[in-house]
Design a protein with these regions (language model features):
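Hydrophobic h-region of N-terminal signal peptides that target proteins for export
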Residues: 10-18
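Hydrophobic/aromatic-rich core segments of domains that either
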Residues: 127-190
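Acidic/histidine-rich, surface-exposed loop or edge segments in extracytoplasmic proteins
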Residues: 40-73, 96-108
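Mid-length scaffold segments of soluble, non-membrane domains
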Residues: 78-138
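Bacterial N-terminal signal peptides that target proteins for export
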Residues: 1-6
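Low-complexity, Gly/Ser/Thr/Pro-rich intrinsically disordered linker/tail segments
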Residues: 191-209
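Short N-terminal segments immediately surrounding and downstream of signal-peptide cleavage
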Residues: 20-43
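Post-signal/leader-peptide non-cytosolic segments of secretory proteins
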Residues: 27-30, 51-56, 63, 170-177, ...
Length: 209
């Protein structure tokens, strides 16, 4: 089954009354750290919790970068794993550990996130990595949206920009279940409608080559 994403509030119009674009913007602008960050869930970031990571959990994230990546490709692989690990740790305390990849399969289930939730949280996880000096080859980018009902359902994801080449890579944590590595691939390939095969395991980060 192909998993398409559009925010829960597009599936359920009554949720529009609870979705606040200004809130999402504020969440995306926060300077997240392991000691303090806001986590959103419920579809369209209708629920927000102020959280902090346990030191032991953050130590596991930092351990992924204990050997300094040799290049941007290797760093993207570490980023993908770090996003999955952060999702796992946060899921244990927020009740989102059962989040199913995609929107439709888990729609209406407790703890399910849509792509607005995922892209917002992933952006803030990326800021944590940056703020702790773990990103040497990338900057945290803006969220990007594809689809707009013209060539597919709207879908939003986080991004990073490679410092050397200035190439933008999507960091998409929505396709797979909670705790799985994020998909990282070039912006244009993602905008062209890339999606994983429904039966395939999570892919390693893809480069421009």
């Amino acid at each position: 089954m192909i998993r398409w994403c559009f925010s829960f509030f597009l599936l359920a119009p009554w949720m529009l009354a609870h979705a606040d674009p200004d809130l999402v913007t504020r969440l995306l602008r926060q300077d997240a750290t392991p000691a303090h960050f806001d986590f959103c869930h419920g579809g369209g970031c209708v629920a927000v919790e102020a959280l902090s990571l346990r030191e032991a959990d953050w130590d596991e994230v930092e351990a992924l970068f204990s050997h300094v990546p040799d290049d941007a490709d290797e760093e993207r692989a570490r980023i993908a794993d770090a996003i999955g690990l952060l999702e796992f740790f946060v899921g244990r305390v927020t009740g989102t550990s059962n989040d199913v990849g995609g929107t439709f399969e888990g729609f209406g289930m407790p703890g399910q996130l849509d792509c607005i939730d995922e892209s917002t949280n992933t952006t803030n996880y990326l800021k944590m990595l940056r703020n702790r000096g773990l990103l040497r080859f990338h900057e945290v980018g803006d969220t990007h949206t594809r689809g707009y009902f013209l060539n597919g359902w709207p879908h939003t994801a986080a991004s990073v920009r490679e410092m050397g080449s200035k190439a933008v890579y999507i960091v998409d944590s929505w396709f797979y279940d909670n705790g799985e590595p994020a998909v990282i691939l070039p912006l244009q390939r993602w905008q062209d409608g890339w999606k994983p095969d429904a039966s395939a395991p999570a892919l390693p980060p893809l480069s421009e080559d």
